[in-house]
From Swiss-Prot:
Subunit structure of this chain's protein: Homododecamer.
Chain's role: Catalyzes a trans-dehydration via an enolate intermediate.
A Pfam family matched in the record: DHquinase_II
Keywords, ordered alphabetically: Amino-acid biosynthesis, Aromatic amino acid biosynthesis, Lyase
UniProt binding sites for substrate: N83, H89, D96, L110, S111, R120
Enzyme class: lyase
Species whose genome carries this gene: Chromobacterium violaceum (strain ATCC 12472 / DSM 30191 / JCM 1249 / CCUG 213 / NBRC 12614 / NCIMB 9131 / NCTC 9757 / MK)
Gene label: aroQ
An example molecular function term from Gene Ontology annotations: 3-dehydroquinate dehydratase activity
InterPro entries: DHquinase_II, DHquinase_II_CS, DHquinase_II_sf
Residue(s) at site: Transition state stabilizer: R26
Protein name (Swiss-Prot/TrEMBL): 3-dehydroquinate dehydratase
SUPFAM superfamilies per UniProt: Type II 3-dehydroquinate dehydratase
Length: 156
């Protein structure tokens, strides 16, 4: 990394939408056996090893996710990884919050949404996202984080 002290000042936010607190239990054929704690622990270690700070929030409530996105205007969040889960297909409000704060983000989905029910194939976020990763299970989060850190390092 070019400037480790700059990276340390850069914070990455991971947002997990509804029902992701049930990972490891809910439909493992689609979402895998990793728990949300497993995923967050690996992401925190990956970010720390590269000199970045990372925070994560899971909520089943749309307004809590929106309020956390709004906080990015004041807290120095440099990048967002978001798995909007079911809000992917329904939440214009969450989309508007991401558009308003202008923090780059990657949309992550554990399952391949394009191989599932038709209603899961529409996203209100993809056209705003720097990228979209789906169908790679929990590893998709790690790939998204690696790209976020590379993106932030290139901006330095």
């Amino acid at each position: 990394m070019k400037n480790r002290s700059l990276a340390l000042s850069q914070s990455i936010l991971v947002l997990h939408g509804p029902n992701l607190n049930l990972l490891g239990v809910r439909e493992p054929q689609h979402y895998g056996r990793d728990t949300l704690d497993d995923i967050n622990r690996r992401l925190t270690q990956q970010a720390k090893a590269a000199g970045f700070s990372l925070s994560a929030l899971q909520s089943n409530a749309e307004h809590i996710l929106i309020e956390r996105i709004h906080q990015c205007l004041d807290d120095g969040t440099a990048f967002i990884l978001i798995n909007p889960a079911a809000f992917t297909h329904t939440s214009v409000a969450l989309r508007d919050a991401l558009a308003a704060v202008k923090v780059p983000f990657i949309e992550v989905h554990l399952s391949n949404v394009h191989a599932r029910e038709p209603f899961r194939q529409h996203s209100y976020f993809s056209d705003l996202a720097l990228g979209v990763i789906c169908g790679l299970g929990a590893h998709g989060y790690e790939l998204a984080l690696a790209h976020a850190m590379r993106h932030l390092s290139a901006q330095a």
